[in-house]
């Protein structure tokens, strides 16, 4: 990724090898502008191995969190969003079709437990960029489930090792995206799977 793995992307013009350029045929310029952040969510979902019928929680309903919601749903998962902003939760349920939006605050953990008969979620994604939220997210992972940290923070995060082992969790870090993820996003756009309302 230019600007991540190799410096020199903050310039008006640059040359790159042809194989690294993705043709955005069949998508609008507005759609093409969304490909990068959608690819980050698609990459996280691919790394998680989300399967049809699984219960997914996405903590953080910003652009990358919404991308994870979209691609988890495309794999057949039932998605719940957790965020502190009601307007974002309303958008996720209305425009993205997620099963539920839960507002961060007193009683949120009880609401999440109620949605899963107390088992919590097969896969939890954190897209908050907040160390406290990242630490709290471990509580929402079902036995045998996975916790995917999309966010990167310049801080240490801690968790209870006995609880982590008791639940036999899998912890996954997800960073950026690959060429395959960009192709996945472009195919989803061409197939009409990315809601137009996302481009606001």
Where are these regions (language model features)?
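Structural detector of well-ordered beta-strand residues that form the stable sheet scaffold
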Residues: 22, 80, 146-148, 172
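Glycine- and other small-residue-rich loops at beta-strand/loop junctions that grip anionic moieties
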Residues: 13, 33, 57-61, 81-82, ...
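Mid-domain Rossmann-like dinucleotide-binding core that forms the NAD(H)/NADP(H) cofactor-binding site
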Residues: 27-106
